[in-house]
Amino acid sequence: MTKIKVANPIVEMDGDEQTRIIWHLIRDKLVLPYLDVDLKYYDLSVEYRDQTNDQVTVDSATATLKYGVAVKCATITPDEARVEEFHLKKMWKSPNGTIRNILGGTVFREPIIIPRIPRLVPQWEKPIIIGRHAFGDQYKATDVIVPEEGELRLVYKSKSGTHDVDLKVFDYPEHGGVAMMMYNTTDSIEGFAKASFELAIERKLPLYSTTKNTILKKYDGKFKDVFEAMYARSYKEKFESLGIWYEHRLIDDMVAQMLKSKGGYIIAMKNYDGDVESDIVAQGFGSLGLMTSVLITPDGKTFESEAAHGTVTRHFRQHQQGKETSTNSIASIFAWTRGIIQRGKLDNTPDVVKFGQILESATVNTVQEDGIMTKDLALILGKSERSAYVTTEEFIDAVESRLKKEFEAAAL
């Protein structure tokens, strides 16, 4: 079998625990036998991040800016227990957060719909894509414990000295409390809006943006104003010609409407809102194991894809004890395929794009047509008997078998 040549490199970011095991199986069984691809490898395991003082995370993001496409395995974000478990030098920051802050851009999370798998929200027939602004707000905030009575002030020193701000925020009573300062930038909000409008055009789906501008009149009002100005200036005519629309909604109203809808739209959300709501949407469509996550920069030139779930520690503990596991690898497979498809689009190599699509089709059809699935999906179908599901490895082997047939039939 002749391998398909991938014109330019893909950055590969390895990860932790059970997803690391899955990642290697996918790469070695489903990707490398079919593609002649230069993978620029970075080990983002928590041990190696610690060894390099997290420099490897920065290096992987820099490489992504250079080559344009990255695929990422799930990684551990250490807490106190993890620092102790791995004897880490310190509690390193979330690698996803570090990468997002270097790349900028917007994280779009989209469900993988398999008709056989029932949805918790049954009327969601079409995808709901959550666009999460991947910069600033709570994720780059400075927060403090206020130990005693005192005054909190908000101070901004402008470079020119003509727009300084010094505002009294609050007088703390005797026992103090907590305080937080967060920020965003006009450039980043504009980039977020552009990426959202561009995806809506590409997917021919209506776009909603959400804020709580009734409460945060200036902070959230800025997001609302940027989106509306950009839509009127650059996108209104394009949207109307495609029969789609843009609308701003209050976050609470949008969430309520979302539950009643049939799906089929994109919602652009601020960083925290998008973090929370994308998990709700994933569960509503069936499982976090059926959710893609891609980060796209506003110019569309830099792209990073990953699974939307964590490292599946519970299954990894079973694996360490020599017990069988049944871990859903679908989102990790799609992390690879979305990166492969994007690489093919950027390089204008249709065979690479087609291979990514065939691997996605083979993965979905392994469940949909062959009825082969991991335990989490069998449980959604109400089946807990051992014969209803396969092991982690058996599922990937079943996808491999189906991929061979679909690949040969496509005659690439």
Curated annotation (Swiss-Prot):
Activity regulation behaviour: By catabolite repression.
GO molecular function: isocitrate dehydrogenase (NADP+) activity; magnesium ion binding; NAD binding
Binding site for NADP(+): 75-77, 82, 260, 310-315, 328
Any one cellular-component term (Gene Ontology): cytosol
Disulfide links within the chain: none
Chemical reaction(s) catalysed: D-threo-isocitrate + NADP(+) = 2-oxoglutarate + CO2 + NADPH
PROSITE patterns to which the protein is assigned, alphabetical: IDH_IMDH
Comment field (misc): Present with 2620 molecules/cell in log phase SD medium.
Family note: Belongs to the isocitrate and isopropylmalate dehydrogenases family.
Protein name according to UniProt: Isocitrate dehydrogenase [NADP] cytoplasmic
Phylogenetic placement of the source organism: Eukaryota, Fungi, Dikarya, Ascomycota, Saccharomycotina
